[in-house]
C-alpha cells in the first residue's frame, strides 16, 4: 500500500531502512510476487528517496543467480533467476539501486533458527514428523543461523558501514 508506506516514512523519518518484505508462498502466483517484491520495493525506494533516508539495506535472494555455474558464487556471477520469486526479487533490487540511496544488498539463502517455518530444514522436519520421505538433489546449500544474522544486522544498520552487494 503506497499511501501507508509514504505515511510511515513521513511520520517516522528513518535514517536507515531495512527492506525485507517478500512474497514466497506460491511459485505459481506471479501477480502476488510482483505486487510484493517489485511494487513493494518501488514504494519503499520512492518513499525513502522523498523522505531523505541515508541508507537502505535490501534483502535479495541467492535465487537471483538461478542455477549457479560455480560454487561458491562470486559477485561477478551473472543473475539468471528462473522462478517468479527470484525474478521479482531481482527486479526489486534494481529499483532499490535506482533510488540513488546508498544501498547494502544481501543475497542470502536459508536463514534458519527458532520459529522459522519456511525453508529446507522446517520442510524436512515436517516431512519426517508425518512419516513422509525426504529427498535431496545433487546440490549445495548455504545456511545462516538467525543469531548470526541478527549479530550481522546490528553492524549493518550503522550509517558508516559499507554499501554494495554481498553474498
Task: Please report, for each region that a protein language model flagged, where it lies by residue.
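Conserved Rossmann-fold NAD(P)-dependent oxidoreductase catalytic core, especially the SDR/UDP-sugar
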Residues: 19, 42-84, 104
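Conserved catalytic-site region of short-chain dehydrogenase/reductase
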Residues: 25-27, 58-72, 84-90, 111-118
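Conserved catalytic Lys-bearing alpha helix of Rossmann-like short-chain dehydrogenase/reductases
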Residues: 38-44, 86-96
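Short-chain dehydrogenase/reductase
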Residues: 109, 165-167
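NAD(P)H-binding glycine-rich loop region in Rossmannoid oxidoreductase-like domains
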Residues: 1-36
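NAD(P)-dependent short-chain dehydrogenase/reductase
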Residues: 82, 94-155
Amino acid at each position: 500500500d503506497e499511501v501507508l508506506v509514504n505515511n510511515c516514512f513521513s511520520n517516522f523519518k528513518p535514517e536507515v531502512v531495512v527492506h525485507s518484505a517478500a512474497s514466497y508462498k506460491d511459485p505459481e502466483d506471479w501477480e502476488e510476487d510482483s505486487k510484493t517484491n517489485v511494487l513493494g520495493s518501488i514504494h519503499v525506494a520512492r518513499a525513502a528517496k522523498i523522505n531523505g533516508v541515508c541508507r537502505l539495506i535490501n534483502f535479495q535472494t541467492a535465487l537471483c543467480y538461478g542455477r549457479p555455474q560455480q560454487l561458491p558464487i562470486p559477485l561477478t556471477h551473472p543473475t539468471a533467476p528462473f522462478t517468479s520469486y527470484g525474478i521479482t526479487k531481482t527486479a526489486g533490487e534494481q529499483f532499490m539501486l535506482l533510488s540513488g540511496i546508498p544501498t547494502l544488498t544481501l543475497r542470502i539463502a536459508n536463514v534458519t533458527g527458532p520459529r522459522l517455518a519456511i525453508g529446507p530444514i522446517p520442510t524436512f522436519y515436517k516431512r519426517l514428523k508425518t512419516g513422509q520421505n525426504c529427498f535431496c538433489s545433487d546440490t549445495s546449500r548455504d545456511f545462516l543461523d538467525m543469531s548470526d544474522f541478527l549479530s550481522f544486522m546490528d553492524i549493518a544498520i550503522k550509517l558508516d558501514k559499507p554499501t554494495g552487494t554481498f553474498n
